[in-house]
């Protein structure tokens, strides 16, 4: 039996905060792997600004050097909204001997009461919550918490900085920054 942490998100772009969360949860919970699952269309956000191909390429570059980090693009292959329930149902059907843990930030802990089919989802997985500045970890739902170093970082902040040609060194993996530059993503590198 393998124990797998799931880290979902738009990863637009994937940054060091994502990698920090994944590694800290993997170590604290002694998980075998962390699977990065980029969403197609998240139900709680507007569409992503970057294509699925670019996002998967950037994730792969970000996680390449870590043997316990894997990319799973199952949600990108699905049409429409990406609901966690559908993803976990598919994963448990495909990998019945695995135990799955779904990693969420404080922003999503607060949002749990509004999740699609939350009661059924709670029977299928264990949620692992990590702190995120500005959000509470208080919930009536069963969530295991992992204390991680917190940094005020989001993909939204990084996209804005890239568009404004502001300094982002040490916030993105170098390989992802090179990819952004080469493909002129987020307005970076355009005149």
Swiss-Prot record:
It catalyses: nicotinate beta-D-ribonucleotide + ATP + H(+) = deamido-NAD(+) + diphosphate. GO terms for molecular function: ATP binding; nicotinate-nucleotide adenylyltransferase activity. Signal peptide: none annotated. Its EC number is 2.7.7.18. One of its GO terms (biological process) is NAD biosynthetic process. InterPro entries: Cyt_trans-like, NadD/NMNAT, Rossmann-like_a/b/a_fold. Pfam families: CTP_transf_like. SUPFAM superfamilies: Nucleotidylyl transferase. Belongs to the NadD family. Catalyzes the reversible adenylation of nicotinate mononucleotide (NaMN) to nicotinic acid adenine dinucleotide (NaAD). This is Probable nicotinate-nucleotide adenylyltransferase. It comes from Oceanobacillus iheyensis (strain DSM 14371 / CIP 107618 / JCM 11309 / KCTC 3954 / HTE831). The gene is nadD.
């Amino acid at each position: 039996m393998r124990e797998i942490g799931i880290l979902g998100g738009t990863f637009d772009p994937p940054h060091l905060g994502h990698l920090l969360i994944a590694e800290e949860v993997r170590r604290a919970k002694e998980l075998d792997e962390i699977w990065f699952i980029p969403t197609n269309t998240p139900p709680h956000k507007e569409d992503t600004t970057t294509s699925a191909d670019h996002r998967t390429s950037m994730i792969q570059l970000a996680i390449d050097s870590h043997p316990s980090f894997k990319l799973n693009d199952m949600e990108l292959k699905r049409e429409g909204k990406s609901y966690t329930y559908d993803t976990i149902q598919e994963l448990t059907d495909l990998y019945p001997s695995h135990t799955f843990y779904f990693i969420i930030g404080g922003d999503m802990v607060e949002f749990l009461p509004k999740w699609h089919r939350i009661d059924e989802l709670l029977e299928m997985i264990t949620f692992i919550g990590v702190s995120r500045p500005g959000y509470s970890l208080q919930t009536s739902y069963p969530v295991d918490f992992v204390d991680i170093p917190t940094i005020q970082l989001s993909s939204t902040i990084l996209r804005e900085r890239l568009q404004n040609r502001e300094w982002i060194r040490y916030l993105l993996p170098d390989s992802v920054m090179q990819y952004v530059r080469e493909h002129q993503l987020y307005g970076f590198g355009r005149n």
